[in-house]
Swiss-Prot record:
The keyword Disulfide bond applies. Gating-modifier toxin that inhibits voltage-gated sodium channel with a preference for hNav1.7/SCN9A (IC(50)=25.4 nM) over hNav1.1/SCN1A (IC(50)=4.1 uM), hNav1.2/SCN2A (IC(50)=813 nM), and hNav1.6/SCN8A (IC(50)=15.2 uM). Is an effective analgesic in rodent pain models, since it is several-fold more effective than morphine in a rodent model of formalin-induced pain and is equipotent with morphine in its ability to reduce thermal and acid-induced pain. This is Mu-scoloptoxin(03)-Ssm2a. It comes from Scolopendra mutilans. It comes from the Eukaryota. GO terms for cellular component: extracellular region. Belongs to the scoloptoxin-03 family.
Length: 112
Protein backbone atom coordinates (compact mmCIF):
# COMPACT_ATOMS: atom_id res chain seq x y z
CA UNK A 1 0.00 0.00 0.00
CA UNK A 2 2.84 2.36 0.82
CA UNK A 3 4.51 1.75 -2.54
CA UNK A 4 1.22 2.50 -4.34
CA UNK A 5 0.90 5.85 -2.53
CA UNK A 6 4.51 6.76 -3.22
CA UNK A 7 4.07 5.92 -6.92
CA UNK A 8 0.97 8.12 -7.14
CA UNK A 9 2.74 11.03 -5.47
CA UNK A 10 5.77 10.74 -7.77
CA UNK A 11 3.51 10.50 -10.84
CA UNK A 12 1.66 13.64 -9.75
CA UNK A 13 4.94 15.53 -9.25
CA UNK A 14 6.24 14.53 -12.69
CA UNK A 15 2.97 15.46 -14.45
CA UNK A 16 2.66 18.72 -12.51
CA UNK A 17 6.22 19.76 -13.38
CA UNK A 18 5.69 18.90 -17.06
CA UNK A 19 2.46 20.92 -17.15
CA UNK A 20 4.18 23.88 -15.51
CA UNK A 21 6.99 23.82 -18.08
CA UNK A 22 4.47 23.64 -20.92
CA UNK A 23 2.52 26.53 -19.44
CA UNK A 24 5.61 28.72 -19.29
CA UNK A 25 6.42 27.89 -22.89
CA UNK A 26 2.91 28.76 -24.02
CA UNK A 27 3.01 32.07 -22.18
CA UNK A 28 6.30 32.89 -23.86
CA UNK A 29 4.92 32.03 -27.31
CA UNK A 30 1.75 33.99 -26.73
CA UNK A 31 3.65 37.10 -25.69
CA UNK A 32 3.84 40.18 -27.94
CA UNK A 33 7.64 39.86 -27.83
CA UNK A 34 7.52 36.42 -29.43
CA UNK A 35 5.11 37.61 -32.12
CA UNK A 36 7.35 40.62 -32.76
CA UNK A 37 10.38 38.32 -33.01
CA UNK A 38 8.63 36.19 -35.63
CA UNK A 39 7.69 39.34 -37.52
CA UNK A 40 11.18 40.84 -37.50
CA UNK A 41 13.24 37.70 -38.00
CA UNK A 42 11.00 35.63 -40.23
CA UNK A 43 9.23 37.75 -42.75
CA UNK A 44 9.70 41.20 -44.06
CA UNK A 45 6.96 42.23 -46.45
CA UNK A 46 7.85 44.96 -48.87
CA UNK A 47 5.59 48.01 -48.90
CA UNK A 48 4.71 47.39 -52.54
CA UNK A 49 3.78 43.74 -51.97
CA UNK A 50 0.63 42.65 -53.74
CA UNK A 51 -2.01 41.30 -51.41
CA UNK A 52 -4.61 38.64 -52.02
CA UNK A 53 -7.81 38.42 -50.05
CA UNK A 54 -8.59 35.22 -48.18
CA UNK A 55 -11.67 34.97 -45.96
CA UNK A 56 -11.70 38.73 -45.59
CA UNK A 57 -8.03 38.92 -44.58
CA UNK A 58 -5.27 40.45 -46.64
CA UNK A 59 -2.35 38.06 -47.05
CA UNK A 60 0.94 38.91 -48.78
CA UNK A 61 1.37 36.89 -51.98
CA UNK A 62 5.11 36.91 -51.62
CA UNK A 63 7.31 37.05 -48.53
CA UNK A 64 11.02 37.63 -48.19
CA UNK A 65 13.08 35.72 -45.65
CA UNK A 66 15.17 37.99 -43.48
CA UNK A 67 17.62 35.30 -42.39
CA UNK A 68 17.85 31.68 -41.31
CA UNK A 69 16.67 32.53 -37.79
CA UNK A 70 13.17 32.29 -39.24
CA UNK A 71 13.32 28.52 -39.12
CA UNK A 72 14.25 28.52 -35.44
CA UNK A 73 11.49 30.95 -34.51
CA UNK A 74 8.86 28.94 -36.35
CA UNK A 75 10.09 25.70 -34.78
CA UNK A 76 9.82 27.29 -31.32
CA UNK A 77 6.24 28.24 -32.07
CA UNK A 78 5.44 24.70 -33.19
CA UNK A 79 7.12 23.24 -30.10
CA UNK A 80 5.06 25.46 -27.85
CA UNK A 81 1.84 24.55 -29.63
CA UNK A 82 0.68 28.15 -29.41
CA UNK A 83 0.75 29.45 -32.96
CA UNK A 84 -1.93 31.60 -34.53
CA UNK A 85 -3.23 30.96 -38.02
CA UNK A 86 -2.69 34.59 -38.87
CA UNK A 87 -0.61 37.07 -36.92
CA UNK A 88 -1.53 40.69 -37.49
CA UNK A 89 1.35 43.13 -37.07
CA UNK A 90 1.41 46.71 -38.33
CA UNK A 91 -1.66 46.09 -40.46
CA UNK A 92 -0.22 43.05 -42.23
CA UNK A 93 -1.22 39.43 -41.87
CA UNK A 94 1.42 36.72 -41.79
CA UNK A 95 0.81 33.07 -42.29
CA UNK A 96 2.00 31.03 -39.37
CA UNK A 97 2.99 27.37 -39.27
CA UNK A 98 0.61 25.52 -36.99
CA UNK A 99 2.11 22.03 -37.11
CA UNK A 100 4.96 19.95 -38.47
CA UNK A 101 2.81 18.99 -41.45
CA UNK A 102 2.44 22.62 -42.52
CA UNK A 103 6.04 23.54 -41.71
CA UNK A 104 7.45 22.45 -45.09
CA UNK A 105 4.71 24.28 -46.98
CA UNK A 106 5.37 27.39 -44.91
CA UNK A 107 9.12 27.17 -45.52
CA UNK A 108 8.51 26.81 -49.27
CA UNK A 109 6.33 29.91 -49.19
CA UNK A 110 8.94 31.89 -47.28
CA UNK A 111 11.78 30.88 -49.58
CA UNK A 112 10.06 31.81 -52.85
Amino acid sequence: MRIWSLTRILTFIVIFNFAEAGGECMKKCDSPDMIREIFTRCTMVKRDTQFSENSGHLIPKRSVVADNKCENSLRREIACGQCRDKVKTDGYFYECCTSDSTFKKCQDLLHK
